[in-house]
Amino acid sequence: MSKSLVIVESPAKAKTINKYLGSNYVVKSSVGHIRDLPTVGSSNGEKAKAISTKGLSAEEKSAIKQEKDRNALVKRMGIDPYHQWKANYQILPGKEKVVAELKSLAKKADHIYLATDLDREGEAIAWHLREVIGGDDARFSRVVFNEITKNAIQQAFEKPEQLNLDRVNAQQTRRFLDRVVGFMVSPLLWKKVARGLSAGRVQSVAVKLVVEREREIKAFQPEEYWEIDVLTQTQAKQALRLAVTQFKGKKFEPKNATQAQSAVDFLQHADYVVSDLETKPTHSRAKAPFITSTLQQTASTRLGFGVKKTMMLAQRLYEAGYITYMRTDSTNLSQDALKMVRGYIQSHYGESYLPSKPVFYSSKENAQEAHEAIRPSDVNTLAEQLTGMDKDAVRLYDLIWRQFVACQMPAAQYDSTTVTVRAGEYELKAKGRILRFDGWTKVLPTMSKNAEDQVLPDVQLNEKLHLEHVLPEQLFTKPPARFSEAALVKELEKRGIGRPSTYAAIISTIQERGYVRVENRRFYAEKMGEIVTDRLNQSFTALMNYDFTANMENILDQIANGEKNWKTELNQFFKDFSQQLSQAELDELEGGMKPNSLVPTDINCPTCGRKMAIRTASTGVFLGCSGYALPPKERCKTTMNLIPEAELLNVLDEASETKALMERKRCPKCGTAMDSYLIDPERKIHICGHNPNCDGYVLEQGSFKIKGYDGPIVECDKCGADMHLKLGRFGKYMGCTSCDNTRKILKSGEVAPPKEEPTHFPELKCEKSDAYFVLRDGASGVFMSAHNFPKSRETRAPKVAELALYRDRLPEKLRYLADAPQHDPEGNDAIVRFSRKEKRQYVTSEKNGKATKWIVDYLGNQWVERKK
């Protein structure tokens, strides 16, 4: 009897599903996407034939060139917007074996079930599988489930569906839109601004949010204000702290020390009388069960997880069958889920914690109500009962479980009291509240104590209070808060930008592109991010408009629902976009995109004496000689690195941001906060935060050090002086305070080991150049590289036989590598590799360019073959 083939996208999901299906099913994983549009640099098909342009007019030559460029672009993109959006999908590198196995199994199967995830991405993977496997479409069925439980799996297989091509087309539309913008705008940025830049349909809008917040902060000028508290004692000798709230019937808000002192002088001799007492019941309701965005936000604030980590852990929990699908914008709960959780609450917490009827929460507009909120698959499974999950996954599950249970429990009840006191024409208040019934907080305690969570002492109306102290405090208004990852997701969701399936990718992409950076879990806009945002805003107004981007998400929803034709929408977008692109490619004087301008200074070039200019590249802000614009023979390429002042590395919160803003110089031209950089120990330059839009700068002479440094200190391996954390054009590094020695900061945050001098092997020639190999020891272990790096970038793994031959040249700590076996049992050369996970070297071999299964480890001062 033939069996049915079930295809899912992940091995973990396949393993879980396999437990619930009988022996008549074979469950296999596609390990994600099996095909996609061509990757950058890949080229399939014949090379375009050269066309002779001899004897043609300039217009004809131009037309031929345009056609050639267009064809090259279409080939790189893998989609053809000029011919009905024909797509050139290719099997992904490394997926050939997976595809071959699935095709082989499909031939033997009587039916094929496509059980990929229930979102559009999952629908698209299912469609690609059907297209690649081929055959009669009637052999394929689509099964979807919100949770990987026995009941959900059985129900899905009892009612299989057909592939939803509308949802597939919505996914293709998003992919094609992103492809067009990325492949057609990025080259324009290379030409107009700087090499290596990129643009994205949603990515650029997300960067714009960070850039606008950065500029709000830089333009913000903190204003002084004062608050005054008065510490009193009741007739019963109990302490009561009061805040001054009004003066002469108006809000009390002194702006300076003089106004505050005037109030203090009066309050120190005033009589304090209780003028009003008010106690009223208040309550606090639980929040809705998690959707993708709220899970990401709460995991950030409660657990300290980044968006990417949260989704990775949630994916594992889902694939193991512990939670429902984690990409959702619906707060809806199924009737079965409500019955399950209400039964749990009743049996474990009692009737008083069970509302008379289920609690329902409204979802945002366009939410897919067919989906459920994120919840445990089985509320009876507690976090400590999970198996095969790491500690952080268990913590995330516990959070999801508690939110799910709490959302179906009654509100927490309080008695809130306000005491009002008169002191002449001043009014003072104290607020407190007493918890009467904990409700949902029994399961999900609040993170921090509310300022009003205090028990006020008993006082009587008209009671006179005894003055203890008047406590004035100087404060300053705070700038807008920087975005955290979670806060940026919240802002994207509020503006309708992106969807649950794309939030994590957006957050990761904008960091990888180098337009923003994250310090202390808060976003900072890089200068190049500001410049690119300005250029795109100027030339692609619609593309950078928040409402336009949100509307495009709605259009994608309509395509998925079969309400709009996907190619019609693509054609309309491409028509408008192409017009804007053509305009942007023109010269600036003709209305084209403005190039990346430099800001001249009075600083002399140390090489040629010409003036240096403030320049911005994808690696940061630096000084470059104005002579760089001259013809090649006269060109001066001198640059000077600018080191941001170190105190900017340690801004932890809005209060610190306020202090830093107050200490920063203001631009003499526009008043914006200036960014300060060290040129050398004698010169500091302050550059307008709006550079290059504003050319304001201030050069300061003196003797400079990094002031107030309290960061990590490492002993310099060359001179013994202290090395401090610094921030340069290429990111953080440790720099010596005495010599010019530097050390990298690894991705883990650890300081890289001191740089070892390479071991030279003039006898070992490179294959791709006239250079010879040297042995380098880096953060990823030992490797062979060209001696003249970076001129020649050739690298390879060291062979044990080579190390053994020149053993005496090796540093003492590496000589153990020369003692390893020089060949595997089949006679293949043994090579040295590095395990990132275990952070140690091991020896293996290769055959025909592919790794063998032979591995030898260095254990207990000897080389031991690993058991297969």
From Swiss-Prot:
Positions annotated as active site in the UniProt record: Y325
Stretches assigned to the Toprim domain:
3-148
| Chain segments carrying region Interaction with DNA | 198-203
Please give the Pfam families that the UniProt record associates with this protein.
Answer: Topoisom_bac, Toprim, Zn_ribbon_bTOP1, Zn_ribbon_Top1, Zn_Ribbon_Topo
Q: Which residues form the Topo IA-type catalytic domain?
A: 164-581
Q: TM spans, by residue? A: none
Question: Could you give a GO molecular-function term held by this entry?
Answer: DNA topoisomerase type I (single strand cut, ATP-independent) activity
The coenzyme or cofactor needed here is: Mg(2+)
Q: So what EC number does this one have? A: 5.6.2.1
GO BP terms: namely: DNA topological change
Q: Which residues bind Mg(2+)?
A: E9, D117
**Top enzyme category:** isomerase
Identify one Gene Ontology CC term for this UniProt entry: chromosome
**UniProt keyword terms in alphabetical order:** DNA-binding, Isomerase, Magnesium, Metal-binding, Repeat, Topoisomerase, Zinc, Zinc-finger
The similarity comment for this entry is: Belongs to the type IA topoisomerase family.
- Cite the record's note on assembly: Monomer.
Write the protein's name: DNA topoisomerase 1
- Name its species: Pasteurella multocida (strain Pm70)
Query: Gene encoding this polypeptide?
Result: topA
